[in-house]
Structure formats: C-alpha cells, structure tokens
Amino acid sequence: MFDVLMYLFETYIHNEAELRVDQDRLERDLTDAGFDREDIYNALLWLEKLADYQDGLAEPMQLASDPLSMRIYTVEECERLDASCRGFLLFLEQIQVLNLETREMVIERVLALDTAEFDLEDLKWVILMVLFNIPGCENAYQQMEELLFEVNEGMLH
C-alpha cells in the first residue's frame, strides 16, 4: 500500500499533474503500473481519510496547547514509530514545521498504513503528504520538502 501512495504522490501530486483524475481511470493506471488491487484500494481509502482533514470532515484529537506539555506515545505508536521517528517528529515541532494538530494527523495516518516495515524515510513522505493536504500548511510543506530533498541531495555527493 505504501508503494502505491508513494507512486501517487510522486506521479500526480508532487509533479502537479491533473489532480481531478477519474477514480476508475486512476485504478486502471495503477493496475497497469503493476500494483495489487487490494493495495490500490487501501491506498485510495487512506487518501480519502486524509482528504477528510482537508475538507474539515475529520478533526484530530482535541489537544492541550501548553507548550511545556510532552507527547507520550502508546505502545502501538512506539511499535510503528521507532526512536528516530519520534525524535524527528519532536524536531519538526521545535522548528514549527508541525504543530500539535498536524503531528497528530501524521501519527494517525502512519498508524493507518498496513505495512510491516516503516522507517524515518517513510515517515518523511507521510509528513509531506499530510502537509500537502492541509489548507494553510503551505510554508510547512515547503520547509519539509526542503529538509527532505536537501538531505537526500547531500547524500549523493
């Protein structure tokens, strides 16, 4: 499923392709690209839930906005998000790429993935997808994109 999400994000969203693609056509394109039907269905459902945030149909948990509060992760969250992922989320909050609400959206979308393996690089892409879909997060998206591609480009040299 995560591979389908990455393909969709890179092909349609990140490259600013036509976003209003017919779902049947999109499913055909993904099937033609070699993706499994169940993975396609799960990825589209995942994106639908993400779009609910954009449309205001879903809201993250109501959170205390005390700047001194600290996020305690559940066992399930710790199993999916290792220490480096949790540290990266904290870092993004500290530099104000994420706020309490967008952090919770990211965590919720990570937990909704049906993948056995999940690492820091995967988390960065989920963060980009979430920020891209939330109105008013354009600057945060741009900062996150710079962080992601700046680090990756530096690794190539």
Curated annotation (Swiss-Prot):
A Pfam family that the UniProt record links to this protein: DUF494
InterPro entries hit by this protein: Smg
Secretion signal span: none
Disulfide bond residue pairs: none
Stated family: Belongs to the Smg family.
Name of the protein: Protein Smg
